[in-house]
Amino acid sequence: MSDITRIAVVGLGLIGKRHANILCRTPGVELSGVVEQSEGGQQEARRLGVPVFASLDELLSNGGSDGIILATPTPLHVDQGLACIAHECPVLIEKPIAVTAGEAKLLTDAAAAA
């Protein structure tokens, strides 16, 4: 087992960039990749020297991350969070975790059952 914890960031908007930059400066942590569609976000990932994935599914299939930070728009959190849980990949979801309380419960129930 490696002494380095590999964390990926999904979404390189304002918050995602903050997460990515902090991860790059944290001892014992490696920014293992990003998922980003925008050209600006892809340029930022290249500047950071990390792989860019076209989708969360591609990132999860790669298997190169010990955890994922979801810094995407709130309406995407439930599907993305459930995908991470299904792949048994620890996930930090930026707040709010869902649009409705029912969606949030769906996520927390899935995490508790995992």
Where are these regions (language model features)?
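N-terminal Rossmann-like dinucleotide-binding module
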Residues: 1-48
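Intrinsic low-complexity, intrinsically disordered segments enriched in polar/basic residues
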Residues: 1-2, 64, 113
